[in-house]
Amino acid sequence: SDVYKRQFMSWYNEAIFYHIYPLGLTGAPKHNDYSAPVSRLNTLLPWIDHIREIGCTALYIGPLFESVGHGYETTDYKKLDSRLGTNEDLKNFVAACHEKEIKVIFDGVFNHTGRDFFAFKDIQQNREHSRYLNWYCNVNFGGNTEYNDGFSYENWGGYNLLVKLNQRNPEVQNYICDVIRFWVSEFDVDGIRLDAADVLDFDFMRALRRTAAEVKEDFWLMGEVIHGDYSRWVNGETLHSVTNYALHKALYSGHNDHNYFEIAHTVKYLQNMGNLDLYNFVDNHDVERIYTKLSNKAHFAPVHVLLYTLPGVPSIYYGSEFGIEGKKEKFSDDSLRPALDIKDYADAVQKNPCTALIAALGKIRQHTPALSYGSYAELQLTNRQFAFARDLDGIRVIVTVNNDDNAADMSLPAGNCAEYIGTLTGRKVPAVSYTHLRA
């Protein structure tokens, strides 16, 4: 069939995401002293028009909730971080996005909590007698940590600041499902990106999926998964999507090494997992900016053409549409999460070639259902040139990219089409049995 998952059509199949790390973008202090709320989230309201202008239709924003530092050591799942403002501010922000027809998903940090979370504090206070002992993994009163609590516990990633929740405990499951219900009723959120989904318990994710189905039609669950067979997570029982780190790696190294075989092989490998709508990205708050990563800055264009046209849901990390740089440092991700003022980029779509390209690709994708639902077929592949087709209901979209310093002629089978239209240029190319395209 020509139809690529079309029977499951939902807003997220056609979405183009924008990704904001709010504590960074708003320039919030690194440490939360839990003092009176400061409404920094409101400074992001002017970004909403920009998000629409570059063609994005959904926003992934987070972490948002009360925490002591970078946002992933949660203190309170039901309260906006004081450094960002009040729950009322968040409610208004989501409503403003919805007014512009932008869906909103929050970061859900459910693998671990911070040490200031109420259940952990209860264990510190009541020790062996705490009713929350089984909310965490491997609490051991024969051990200790650098915090000198008089007990040890399982953490995430070697950081004792992040205390691993016991997701098999029905009380924990019920509590987190209740958090999701609260986020929907209080803020009208449209989905959740699950932090550290690759270490979440599968039964726990099944419980989240059941809750997602109850709270809102088309409520989207997307998980952070680095390695592995993505179909273990993306299926009818657990998550709708996961982060496509495999394609992320291939997109930059396939250009840096002049090796389109790596990208084509990765796409084939992903296709073999089934029709998964993966969350595609070239950078985010944890990895170096694409503009920094690319040896040849001119490759910004073919990288993003592929991001927007290969199977999956594309995402842009705030600031990367302007071509900003950001190098990962050894002990800090601050350089990847800068404060920016949208006023400094007022005419970016007109004046910045990177932004103009992203806006043009956004428009093309929005008006080309084959890029969301079409089947995928590789047409031509060399180290330096790559062509593929997306087919849907008799419409064929052909994408050609070239990573060489010189223009290249590519001969491609024209299929049954009478003519081709060069989408970025608008010029028509008559179709013969083979069509020559200069990439």
Question: Where are the regions a protein language model picked out?
Answer:
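Loop/helix patches that line or flank the sugar-binding groove of alpha-linked glycan CAZymes
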Residues: 8-14, 31, 36, 262-417
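Aromatic- and acidic-residue-enriched segments that line the glycan-binding/catalytic groove
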Residues: 73-81, 112-147, 236-245, 331-335
